Design a protein with these regions (language model features):
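A periodicity- and composition-biased signal for non-globular, repetitive helical segments
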Residues: 12-13, 50
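Hydrophobic h-region of N-terminal signal peptides that target proteins for export
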Residues: 13-22
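Bacterial N-terminal signal peptides that target proteins for export
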Residues: 1-12
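N-terminal maturation segment of proteins
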Residues: 24-584
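A general, composition-driven signal for non-globular sequence regions
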Residues: 1, 17-18, 38, 411
C-alpha cells in the first residue's frame, strides 16, 4: 500500500485528539449530513495537500501539509467541530447509506482520538513511513503533463526546507517527552536519508519527470523548468536533507531508546493496546492475538505438510521449503525476470475474475520495482492510482538481490498486491459512485490488508494459478508468514522479546525472512497484526454465508457484499455483510 497516503490518513485521524463537547442544538447555519460529508472532504484536501495529489485533485499540488504546532492545534479544533456536528444526527433520522457513512466518520475521529498520542512518534521516524519517504513518494505520484504540473513539482521541492523544519520540531517534542523511536529504526532512516542525497540533481528521483517531457511542452519551457528544478534541488532540497541527516545523527540518535519494545516507553502498554485497536479495528488484547497466532501457525503448517505429501515429499515442512529454495531454478536470476513473471501472473488472473466478481475496476494496473534507495528495507507494496485513470495503480515489487528470493511464493504476492487483492479492492472503492468522497479515500488496515490476504486464497478458485503443489505451498507459506507476525509483533511489544528472539521464531516457522521484517514491526507496532485478523473475519463471514445460504450461495454476491461499501471497520463489515446476505 502507498505509505505516504497511509501516513496522511493516520495524521488526519490523529488530529481529533481533544475532548468532545456535547453536540449543540441545530441552528440556521447547521448543514445537512450530506453537506457535512462534502465539507469534511474539502477540508481534508485543503489541510492535507498530499492526499489531494493521491486522489487526483490538483488544486493543492504546489503545497505540503503544514505540520507546525499552530496548524496542528487548529486542526484539532476543526476535528472536534466535525465530530460535534456528526453526533448531532440521530441514526433514526437517516437512511441506511447515511447511517453507515455517519458511523464511519464518527469511527475515524474517535479512533484517531485514542491513537493520537502514539501515531506521530511512529510515523515521523520510520524506515517505511518517515517524512523523508513521504516527500519522494508524493513527488513520484504527481502528474507531469502540463507546464503547471512541472511548476508544481518545482514549488514543492523549493518548500522541502519547511517540511524538514516542521518535522524536526516534532522530533524535538519526542525527545522532550521521552518517546523517541528505537535506535535500530533511526539508523535505518539515516541510511535512507543519506542514499537520497545524490551528488547532482540529474541523479535524483525527485527530478525523474524532467528527463522526458510531453511533446506538448515547448522547448523553451523545458529548458526553464529543468533549470528551475535543478536550482530547487541544489539550493533547497540538498541543504534540507543534509540538515535532516545531521539532526538524526547528532541530536536524535543519542536520545533514541535502546529497547525495541513500545512498552519500554512511558504508558507503553496503553500505547500498544491503542495501536492494536487502531490497526486491526478489533478489541483483541495482545495476549489473545499471541495465542491466536500460535494456533494459526500450527494449523497452517499441518496444511503445508499435506501439500508436501501431495508433491511426493515425505520429509518435514522445513525440509520441503529448503528443497524448493535450493533446487535448480528455485530462485530468480535477475530483477527483470521477477518483474516479467509478476506481470504474467496478473495477466493470467484477469480473465478469470468474472467467475468470482460482478464488478471489476476500470483503473489500469502497472508493475515496477521499488527504487534502489529503499529496496533493502522496504517490502513490496501497492500504490493507488487516480479515479480518472491518469495514474495507474502500481504494484511496487521488491526485486532486491533476486538471486536470494524464492520463486514459489511470488504468485501469492502478486494476487495480494494486484488482483484480486489491493488493486481490485481499492480501485473498486475509488470508483463507487454512491459513496461520499471521504469514504473513497478511507483506509483501515484490518479491512484492506485482510482483503489482500484473503485474495491470496482465491487463487485456488481461479484456474490459472497455484497449478503446481509448490505454488500452493507458497500460498500457505505466505498465510503462515502473516500468522507468524501475530506471534512476533506481540512477542516484541507485549512480552519483551529481543530482536534475536523474534528472528529465531521467524527462522523456525517462516525461514528466509530477514531482519528487515523484524525491524518493520519494531518501527510500526501493531500494524502487521491487521492482515491475519482481517482475513480471518472475511473467511468467517464467508463460512457463515455458505452455511446459511447452502445451494443459494454465490461467491460473487458475497464479494459484492464485502466490497460494495468500501473500507469498513471489521465490526461494521460484519453488520453490513450479514444484513446484505440476510445471514446471522
Amino acid at each position: 500500500m502507498r505509505r505516504a497516503f497511509r501516513r496522511l490518513v493516520l495524521i488526519a485521524l490523529a488530529f481529533a485528539s481533544v475532548a468532545i463537547a456535547t453536540p449543540r442544538a441545530q441552528g440556521p447555519s447547521q448543514l445537512g449530513l450530506e453537506e457535512l460529508f462534502t465539507e469534511y472532504w474539502n477540508w481534508r484536501l485543503a489541510e492535507f495537500p498530499e492526499l489531494a495529489t493521491v486522489m487526483g485533485k490538483p488544486q493543492y499540488n504546489d503545497r505540503w501539509t503544514d505540520m507546525s504546532k499552530a496548524a496542528r492545534d487548529k486542526r484539532r479544533a476543526d476535528m472536534r467541530e466535525f465530530l460535534q456536528r456528526v453526533l448531532y444526527f440521530a441514526p433514526g433520522t437517516l437512511n441506511e447509506p447515511q447511517k453507515v457513512s455517519a458511523a464511519l466518520l464518527e469511527y475515524q475521529v474517535r479512533t484517531g482520538m485514542e491513537a493520537e498520542p502514539y501515531l506521530d512518534e511512529i510515523q515521523t521516524v520510520s524506515q517505511g513511513d518517515g517524512f523523508h519517504n513521504d516527500v519522494f513518494e508524493t513527488i513520484d505520484g504527481m502528474p507531469a503533463r502540463t507546464v503547471k504540473d512541472y511548476e508544481n513539482i518545482v514549488a514543492r521541492i523549493r518548500k522541502v526546507p519547511t517540511v524538514v523544519d516542521q518535522n524536526l520540531d516534532m522530533l524535538r517534542e519526542q525527545i522532550a517527552a521521552g518517546t523517541t523511536q528505537p535506535a535500530v529504526v533511526v539508523n535505518l532512516m539515516l541510511d535512507q536519508v543519506r542514499a537520497q542525497i545524490r551528488p547532482s540533481a540529474a541523479e535524483s528521483p525527485l527530478l525523474e519527470a524532467f528527463k522526458k517531457f510531453p511533446a506538448t511542452i515547448a522547448a523553451g519551457d523545458r529548458d526553464r523548468l529543468t533549470k528551475d528544478a535543478t536550482d530547487a534541488y541544489t539550493s533547497a532540497f540538498q541543504p534540507a536533507w543534509r540538515k535532516t541527516e545531521t539532526f538524526l545523527r547528532d541530536t536524535y540518535l543519542p536520545k533514541a531508546r535502546p529497547q525495541i519494545a513500545l512498552t519500554s516507553q512511558p504508558n507503553g502498554k496503553q500505547a500498544y493496546d491503542s495501536l492494536i485497536h487502531y490497526y486491526t479495528t478489533t478489541r483483541m488484547t495482545a495476549a489473545d492475538v499471541h495465542r491466536l497466532g500460535e494456533q494459526e501457525v500450527a494449523r497452517i503448517e499441518t496444511e503445508m505438510q499435506g501439500v508436501a505429501r501431495q508433491a511426493g515429499f515425505t520429509g518435514s515442512v522445513a525440509d520441503f521449503e529448503k528443497q524448493l529454495a535450493t533446487s535448480p531454478g528455485g530462485k530468480w536470476t535477475s530483477k527483470e525476470e521477477m518483474l516479467t513473471y509478476a506481470r504474467d501472473v496478473a495477466m493470467r488472473v484477469y480473465p478469470e475474475l468474472p467467475r468470482l466478481f460482478r464488478r471489476l475496476p476500470r483503473m489500469p494496473l502497472g508493475v515496477r520495482p521499488i527504487t534502489p534507495d529503499r529496496e533493502a528495507s522496504t517490502a513490496s507494496n501497492y500504490s493507488r492510482g487516480t479515479p480518472d485513470g491518469s495514474r495507474p495503480g502500481w504494484f511496487n515489487m521488491n526485486t532486491y538481490k533476486p538471486q536470494e528470493q524464492v520463486k514459489y511464493r511470488v504468485e501469492a504476492l502478486v494476487l495480494h498486491e494486484t488482483i484480486p487483492g489491493h488493486h481490485l479492492q481499492i480501485a473498486t472503492q475509488m470508483e463507487l459512485e454512491d459513496l461520499p468522497e471521504f469514504r473513497k479515500a478511507f483506509i483501515a488496515s484490518g479491512f484492506t490488508e485482510g482483503w489482500g490476504l484473503y485474495a491470496e486464497s482465491l487463487g485456488s478458485e481461479l484456474g490459472s494459478v497455484y497449478l503446481e503443489p509448490s505454488t500452493k505451498f507458497g500460498q500457505l507459506a505466505s498465510e503462515r508468514f502473516r500468522a507468524v507476525r501475530l506471534v512476533v509483533d506481540t512477542g516484541i511489544h507485549a512480552l519483551g522479546w529481543s530482536r534475536e528472539q523474534a528472528l529465531a521464531y521467524f527462522q523456525q516457522h517462516s525461514p528466509g525472512e530477514s531482519t528487515a521484517e523484524i525491524d518493520r514491526y519494531i518501527a510500526r507496532p501493531g500494524q502487521a497484526l491487521a492482515y491475519k485478523l482481517g482475513e480471518l473475519k472475511i473467511k468467517e463471514l464467508r463460512r457463515r454465508a455458505e452455511r446459511a445460504l447452502g445451494s443459494r450461495f454465490d461467491v460473487r454476491d458475497f464479494h459484492d457484499a464485502v466490497l460494495r461499501n468500501g473500507t469498513l471497520p471489521l465490526d461494521l463489515l460484519d453488520t453490513e455483510v450479514s444484513t446484505a446476505l440476510k445471514i446471522q
